[in-house]
Design a protein with these regions (language model features):
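Long, low-complexity, intrinsically disordered segments
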Residues: 185-187
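Conserved beta-sheet core of the metallophosphoesterase superfamily
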Residues: 87-178
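Helix-adjacent hinge/juxtasegments
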Residues: 61-101
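Hydrophobic "anchor" residues on beta-strands that sit immediately upstream
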Residues: 20, 60, 79, 123-124
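Active-site flanking residues adjacent to catalytic metal/cofactor-binding acidic residues
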Residues: 23, 62-64, 83, 113, ...
Length: 187
């Protein structure tokens, strides 16, 4: 399942497959407890993830994985969008079926990334922000922001969240209308 495969997960033919999304496991990082003192152990984090993700499910991790040995224990078809702490980790392709070094755009309104991305006509699912700051048209799936369990992406998208995002076409028309109205007022 290549890039088109990840995109296909969101089409009707994949509706029986569950897609989970999560970020910032930081496996093996002893300093993370200084930032997030209530964080569970690496072993507990693996258990939390595997308690949700089945062997036939897809798990999309949005970066900052850490120790690859823990990632090997995770279930499912694993996809990685690398984060800022994943630089130089060449062995990720041994564990993940798909590895992306940058953001992944899915359809016209959804972008998956490690760090938050501000694109007015897209909904951004990201990690990186351990404090869990709220942003319009964003979902932060950083482990520390969502209670250390992955989110069922299928169920989340079924809430209609993408329908609340204005399309680039609507934004373009609105901007053009606004400019026209300003010109008319000046006359």
């Amino acid at each position: 399942m290549a890039l088109s495969g990840v995109y296909d997960l969101f089409n009707d033919k994949w509706c029986n497959q569950t897609v989970w999304i999560f970020s910032d496991t930081h496996f093996g990082d002893t300093d993370i407890k200084k930032v997030c003192p209530n964080r569970p152990s690496d072993e507990e984090l693996v258990k939390n993830i595997n308690s949700k993700v089945g062997r036939k499910d897809t798990l999309i991790l949005l970066g900052d994985i850490g120790d690859i040995e823990y990632a090997k224990q995770l279930r499912g078809y694993k996809v990685l969008i690398a984060g800022n702490h994943d630089a130089g980790m060449s062995n990720y392709s041994d564990v993940f079926k798909e590895v992306y070094s940058g953001a992944l755009i899915i359809g016209e309104k959804l972008i998956l990334s490690h760090e938050p991305v501000e694109i007015p006509w897209m909904f951004n699912i990201h990690g990186h922000d351990h404090a869990g700051a709220k942003r319009k048209n964003h979902l932060n799936v950083c482990a520390d922001a969502i209670g250390y369990f992955p989110i069922n992406l299928n169920q989340y998208l079924k809430t209609g969240i993408l329908s609340k995002v204005e399309s680039i076409h609507r934004l373009t028309i609105d901007k053009a209308t606004e400019r026209k109205n300003k010109r008319m007022k000046k006359r």
